[in-house]
Every structure is written in C-alpha cells, then in structure tokens.
Design a protein with these regions (language model features):
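Basic, short loop/linker segments at the boundary and entry of helix-turn-helix/winged-helix-like folds
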Residues: 9-49, 55, 427
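A general alpha-helix detector
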Residues: 2, 46-52, 89
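Anion-binding and metal-coordination hotspots
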Residues: 51, 59-72, 83-507
Length: 507
C-alpha cells in the first residue's frame, strides 16, 4: 500500500500537498550548487515542502526534529518519499538556499491563499510583540555609557599629550591637543614618539622588580588609548543612530523591556520587535525591527506592505502604541485613514470629566481676535515656537503664557506653580486626535477595534501559546527575518487548512 492510503482524507499533509501543487517551487531553487561527485542529492522541491510543512504542523520545528520526523512520521515520509536527510542537510538547505528567496515564497503563498479565500487587504490589523533573542542576558553594551567612557579617554589623552609635548620640547615635535581624537591619530603619535626616542619594544620591561622608563610608559599609554578608542568606535558603529544598546552575543539584538519578566527584577532583555499586519486572520505582512517602540515600526511596515501588494491599506487599525504625529502625517500623505489610537485615547473617550475639563489648554476658548483665554478671562500670548525632538516633518509646539495669574480664584485648579501659567499646544496634532476619536468611536471604528483585538493580538496568542513559538532561535537580523518568515508561512498554511477542513466538514 502507498503511504497516502494510511492518511486520513482531511490530513493536513494532503491539504498542504494539494495547495503547494499549484505553486511553481522550482523557481526558488535555481541557486543550488551542482555537485558532480558524491551521493545523489535530495530532491530540493521535496526538501522545501518538508520544511514548510514542518512549520505548518508544529509552529516552529528544529533541524533535529525535522530529521526525526522524516524517520517516524508518515506525513513527512510522504513528502520526502521515504528519504531521511540529516539535520545538517536541512540546516544547509534553509540557510543557503531559502535565505534569499523566503520572502518571495511568503508572498506567492499569500497571493494564492488570498485569491482563494477572497481576503480583504484594505482592512489591516496591526500589532507588535517583543521576542527574546538567542543572546546572553547580561551581554549588554550601552551606547551612552560607551560615549561617556570615550570622552573620559579623551581627557586622559589630553593630559598625556601635554606631558609628552613638555618632554619633546627639545626635539621640535609637538602633538596637537584637541577635544576629541581619532584612533589613527594616536597611532601616528605613537610612531612619532617611538621615532623621536628610538624606542625598541624588545627592550621593554614588565612585572615586579622592574621600573618602566618614562618613554615606555608614555608609548604604552598611546597604544592603549588608541586600542580603546578603536573599541569604542566599533561599539558605537554597531549601535547605529537608531539604537542605544546591543548584545555582545547577537549584535542585531536590542535590549528591551518585555512583558514576560521571568527573572523577576524588571531587567531589560535582548529582543527583537516583530510586527505583523493581519487580514482576515492571515498574516499579510511581517517585519522584524530593532526599535523598542512600536511607534517607529509603523512606517516601515506600511512601506513593506506597499512593496508587496502595490498599494497601501485603506484602514490600518492599531493600538495606542502607533498613534504619533509622524504616523498620522504619513497616513495623510498616502491616502490612509487614521484608525490608530493615540496614547490618551482611552482617557479621552471614557473620562468625560477629563475630556471636558475647562482648565485643559485644548479646551480654552479662542476669541474673534484670535487670542486664547482661560476660564478667568485672562489672555494667553505666544512666547515662542519649539521644534519637537525626533520629528521628521518639522512639528512645532507653540508655547503660550498667561498675561497675569495673580489673584486668580482658579489658581489651585489651573496651575501647580506660583508663576504665570505656561501651556504648550499643537493645534494640528489636536485636530488629528479629534479625527481619530471620531473614526474609532463610529460603528465601523468599534467593529474594527474589536476585530483588531481578535485577529492581530490573537495571531500572537496562537503563535506563542498554541504553537509554542516564544523565543527567537537564530542570531543576526537576516537569520531572524528568515525564521519569522518561516513561522508566518506555517501560520498561514495552518489557518488555511483549518478553514478548508471546516468547509469540508460542513459539506
């Protein structure tokens, strides 16, 4: 009897095999190197199917588990036609063959699912979750700490240069004293110093009972500081402009505060920020970021969606972690409706006392003369405009100050200091917040919010609790992205099979 004769008609492997039969898999396998000696290679199409089915069936499957399943599991035997590749073979296939084509495979599988299931891509439910990286917990490197250490070394170099210049007065050589120094300059200074005193490193003394000469001490200090500066430059370069930390055992991982605090000390852990956009329970777009905040991940995710599908979703629905001025402006520029909550959304919509508080600056009336007035009728005049840090679109806050708060009967309710009250206002952002409230408080908005909590958060719930994928296994941003794509493909195929099974059962 054939293996398929032992399988149930609704077995996931049969659904998977029928589905993959409609996709041209050979085009992803063109880069496999040709070997003309040794044993015959395994069929790459069967290998690809086996890997994808493993992630569909298990959520995440290790290389050792793939090897074992091919020996004992009928489903894997059916796909591999009784062949049993080793875990090394699977590892080579995933890392060398699939690494460059995995995103295209994800897109083509999604395209077929979405056409079959008539998935609505105009409504995209967005959420992010931090997955702990495969890195040591106490392997952090902090960018600010590194910069402080570097400036302390700069001060030591300045002191050392002053001593050396005094020593080299008779030779006519003078080292330039600056506020900052490059490692290359220190190496040149060490060479000049060695040449001036004709230093022979083989004559250096070390250890107890030996006294170093002034020239040896200065020369060794120059070499030591140059090495230190090179180390600091490398650390700052690895961090980049957008990160404040990284792990020594996985340079791509950033230290973040994650919800699962199993250490019980509120400790930052190395992690990746995984973002998904879900449409009709399927992962339509997925991205891996090194940002700690979801706010910075919205635009890259939308651009990735556009690159994949050729348009932006009309209704991206997200929680309060995504509502920022930058993201709202991006939505306006690309014809996207604003359905992302902002930080104070819940308080604005549920606490009417706070929302209508007459002492909030946004509720101060503005007269026909354009002057803002407080409940006591005092005028507020513009003092200056201030650029908001980290803003991409030139956002400015207007700072107003009351003309005179002395003797005000509402002083205790209105202000906390003895000075005239100062308020900061961004009318454009306030108008955006009001638009978001109107969108999300409508009947359509309420349905979209409910669906987001079910679909987007539910996707991570299925990944972590039902399919036991709670931690990143690979290291390096490229390898992590490969892993997340495999998990996402497995999730979508798992969902597709369940829906097909429901239809077959109902029929």
């Amino acid at each position: 009897m054939l293996i398929q004769d032992y399988l149930d008609i609704c077995d996931p492997v049969l659904t998977f095999d029928r589905f993959m039969g409609g996709i041209e898999l050979e085009k992803y396998l063109k880069n496999i190197p040709q070997h003309y000696t040794g044993r015959l290679r395994y069929d790459p199409v069967s290998m690809l199917k086996t890997v994808l089915f493993g992630f569909m069936e298990n959520g995440y499957i290790s290389l050792r588990e793939l090897e074992d399943q091919c020996k004992v599991n009928l489903c894997f035997m059916y796909l591999m036609d009784h062949q049993t590749p080793s875990y090394r073979t699977f590892g080579y296939f995933i890392n060398e063959v699939l690494a460059d084509s995995i995103e295209e495979i994800f897109q083509d599988i999604n395209k077929k699912i979405f056409e079959t299931e008539h998935v609505d891509l105009q409504h995209l439910y967005i959420d992010g979750s931090k997955f702990e990286a495969n890195a040591n917990k106490y392997s952090w490197v902090w960018k600010k700490s590194t910069e402080k250490s570097r400036y302390r070394v700069f001060d030591k170099i300045t002191t050392l240069f002053a001593e050396i210049n005094e020593e080299l007065t008779c030779t006519g050589i003078k080292l330039c004293i600056n506020s900052e120094y490059a490692p290359e300059y220190l190496k040149e200074a060490a060479e000049q110093y060695a040449e001036a005193w004709q230093i022979d490193e083989t004559a250096f003394v070390h250890g107890r009972g030996h006294r170093k000469t002034t020239q040896q001490r200065h020369y060794e200090k120059l070499r030591e500081y140059a090495a230190k500066l090179e180390e600091y430059v490398e650390k700052i370069k690895i961090c980049g402009e957008d990160r404040n930390s990284y792990s020594k055992t996985d340079h791509s991982a950033t230290f973040m505060r994650i919800k699962t605090d199993y250490m019980g000390n509120d400790q930052l852990l190395p992690a990746y920020n995984v973002q998904v956009g879900v449409a009709d329970e399927y992962i339509a777009v997925v991205d891996v970021n090194q940002y700690r905040s979801d706010m910075d991940c919205f635009v890259p995710l939308m651009n990735k969606f556009y690159t994949t599908y050729g348009f932006y979703p009309k209704y991206p629905v997200a929680d309060a972690g995504y509502g920022s001025y930058n993201n709202y402006i991006f939505c306006e520029q690309h014809g996207i409706e604003k359905y992302m909550k902002f930080t104070m959304f819940k308080k604005e919509t549920t606490d009417m006392k706070y929302h209508k508080d007459p002492f909030r600056a946004v509720n101060f009336p503005i007269g026909e003369d354009g002057i803002m007035r407080c409940p006591n009728g005092k005028n507020f005049y513009l003092q200056y405009r201030k650029n908001v840090k980290g803003n991409k679109y030139g956002r400015q806050e207007e700072v107003y100050q009351c003309e005179d708060c002395s003797g005000c009967p509402y002083a205790e309710q209105c202000k906390k200091t003895d000075k005239n009250r100062t308020v900061r206002i961004n009318r454009e952002l306030t108008a955006m917040h009001q638009e978001v409230i109107e969108n999300l408080e409508s009947i359509q908005g309420a349905l979209l919010r409910m669906n987001r909590s079910i679909q987007a958060e539910g996707t991570f719930g299925i990944m972590k609790n039902d399919r036991w994928y709670k931690r990143i296994v690979r290291r390096g941003i490229k390898s992590v992205l490969l892993e997340v794509f495999l998990v996402s493909i497995g999730h979508n195929l798992y969902k597709y099979h369940n829906k097909q099974k429901k239809v077959a059962t109902a029929a």
